[in-house]
Amino acid sequence: GDVYKRQGYAISELSVGQKASFSKTILGADIYNFAGIIGDFNPVHVNAEYAKTTRFGGQIAHGMLTASFISTVLGMALPGADAIFLEQNLKFTAPVHVGDTITATAEIIDMDVKHKILTMKTVVTIQDGTVVVDGQAKIMATKKL
């Protein structure tokens, strides 16, 4: 669910199958701001007229903008505060257009309690359920009880 525990979870409070999500509607301003931060002004992202002429049929979000919401889930919800992002693999499977509502979800699929390492399935979907980013992350849950 969308349970946010800002103080974070200790490894002993977590279990395989636990998951959390974050949703946001992607605005043109989000894409322009992200382009400004990272310096990627590819016209498919920032020029709506040009983007209409591409295979995407319109302006799309940067893949890394879409994927960055995985970090929101991990840092704000599960495991939350004191989480250390160790590793992430990503597969970009479909575009995100201006106005799409994305939902990033992370689910614990394995735990190394001794080393406080979580293996998490990470997925981002849009409003119709289409998977736009698929991946897996390794996170260290360093919060102490």
Predicted regions and their residues:
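Acidic-glycine-rich active-site phosphate/pyrophosphate-binding loop
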Residues: G36-A48, V133
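Hydrophobic core residues within well-ordered beta-strands of beta-rich domains
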Residues: A20, L86, I102-A104, L118-M120, ...
